[in-house]
Swiss-Prot record:
Entry superkingdom: Bacteria
Source organism per UniProt: Bacillus cereus (strain AH187)
Gene (UniProt): rnz
The enzyme's E.C. designation: 3.1.26.11
Cofactor info, note text: Binds 2 Zn(2+) ions.
Keyword Oxidoreductase among record annotations: no
Binding site for Zn(2+) 2: 67-68, 212, 270
Name of the protein: Ribonuclease Z
Residues at the catalytic site: 67
Residues given in the record as Zn(2+) 1 binding sites: 63, 65, 141, 212
Length: 307
């Protein structure tokens, strides 16, 4: 599991930061990539990374401001032109379906893969399978905006190979049957229960990716006990009133959410273009005063998510 930040700016692109898009690489977990927001020129940013459009399985949109969705039509079309045939699902607030369908229709873009568009109308679970559970809550951004909590389900423990070897069980088909929890009988008549040879489960990770938002309780709830919290930091602490007026957060407010939620790690993004060059490091300094395990994203930077 790895984050690749494709765009980390706020509102409009700047020389150093494109607008919002985050790839969550789930290559080891499911051989796929999930995308969170898709601002203008996201597909250009992808060209400079290891992200492959054909592997994008799901796109989660936080809200319908242009800096979060204007890259969608081009990316959806290019995925088809590049030979993508596997299904893709887009999740987002009401209106995302109309935006995509009109853009594709007017441009006569025909995608050659199954495209499903799911409009989120209420809080709660938006996706679940045997590996992941994704839930959402409304944030405070003036228009409907959602934050996402991605919960990886616990992973079965490893087969205790050394224990089996000590008992004289040789590697082979029996190992798989025991790994699957079956009860097997050895040639000498010994009965083995697979459950006795499985180590403790690996706890799944929790990832929280928030859209644009003021400081609010929903952010804390989504981030509770998260292994990684990705939070916007459009403004410095001294501009807290301006952040409130424009439905955004400061770096220190993001750190406060991480602290209150008992998150393990905080990554700041959605940085205003007013912070050019190294001036953005002041945002990082402010956040670390409150929550030490804070990092700040820059375009094309990757962040592995360890277990």
């Amino acid at each position: 599991m790895e984050f690749v930040f494709l765009g980390t700016g706020a509102g409009v692109p700047s020389k150093g930061r494109n607008v919002s898009a985050i790839a969550l690489q789930l290559l080891e977990e499911r051989g796929q990539t999930w995308l969170f927001d898709c601002g203008e020129a996201t597909q250009h940013q992808i060209l400079h990374t290891s992200v492959r459009p054909r592997r994008i399985e799901k796109i989660f949109i936080t809200h319908l401001h242009g800096d979060h969705i204007f890259g969608l039509p081009g990316l959806l079309g290019s995925r088809s032109f590049q030979g993508g045939t596997t299904p893709l699902t887009v999740y987002g607030p009401k209106g995302i379906k109309q935006f995509i369908e009109v853009a594709l229709s007017v441009s006569t873009t025909h995608v050659k893969y199954p495209l499903e568009i799911v409009e989120i109308t209420e809080e709660g679970t938006v996706f679940e399978d045997n590996e992941f559970h994704v839930e959402t809550k409304r944030l405070s951004h003036g228009i409907e905006c959602f934050g996402y909590r991605i919960i990886e389900k616990d992973i079965q423990g490893a087969l205790l190979v050394d224990k089996l070897l000590e008992m004289g069980v040789k590697p082979g088909p029996l190992f798989k049957r025991l790994k699957d929890g079956e009860v097997v009988e050895l040639e000498n008549g010994t009965i083995l229960n697979g459950q006795d040879f499985i180590g403790p489960p690996q706890k799944g990770r929790i990832i929280t990716i928030l859209g644009d938002t003021r400081f609010c309780e929903a952010s804390r709830e989504l981030a509770q006990d998260a292994d990684v919290l990705v939070h916007e930091a459009t403004f410095a602490a001294e501009d807290e009133q301006q952040a409130y007026d424009y439905f955004h957060s400061t770096s220190k407010q993001a750190a406060s959410i991480a602290l209150q939620a008992n998150a393990k790690r905080l990554i700041l993004t959605h940085i205003s273009s007013r912070y050019q060059g190294d001036t953005y490091k002041e945002l990082l300094k402010e956040a670390r005063e409150l929550f030490s395990n804070t990092e700040i994203a820059t375009d094309l930077k990757s962040f592995p998510v360890e277990r």
